[in-house]
């Protein structure tokens, strides 16, 4: 993003609106905002929740940071992409919320695999286990929406991910970096990050998070 920022500043941004949809550390978003606004532009950081399919339908979840005026100016654009845009505070607030939002998802795939490991040798088949989990409070939206992907993965065929292991690992590392910068202890996240690092070393970066579950299930 720094390279893109430099190119924008060199081209001149006075009077323009810059919207950053990427997921960054809040401090990085704040630094970009300072440079862009110093150049005379409005800046909004608005990382989004969702993948390609909801984006095409305008069904993303937008988490916006910036001044009231900048976010108001950005809304006509963001409303084309998002079913909901929440203004969370100054620049960097959107990035902070996005990291908080993605952290439980990254942890979930490891937790799902560990839960399934309890069923090894029991005769309970994955189809039944996943169906029950998806039909209970143990089943987040991602499990209900991606049941077949999870089952195919558990059956032995890793599936391409719309939000793949590499992306999950990147956001998990950013969350840990944010926690460290603020003196927070995130023990579950630290341990899970090691599992993601191992998965990346095995060449699984392009696959769905369920591939992490499969390895954890054994």
Predicted regions and their residues:
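Glycine-rich, highly charged phosphate/nucleotide-binding loops
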Residues: 1-7
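Rossmann-fold dinucleotide-binding core
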Residues: 2, 17, 23-102
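Residues within well-ordered alpha-helical secondary structure of globular protein domains
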Residues: 7, 35, 80, 135, ...
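Short, conserved loop/helix-junction motifs that constitute active-site signature segments
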Residues: 8-14
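Short, well-ordered coil/turn elements that cap or connect secondary structure elements
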Residues: 13, 38, 80-82, 121, ...
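A generic fold-level signal
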Residues: 13, 55-56, 204-207
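Short, proline-enriched alpha-helix->beta-strand connector loops that line the catalytic pocket
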Residues: 15-16, 115
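Helical "substrate-binding/catalytic lid" subdomain
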Residues: 94-216
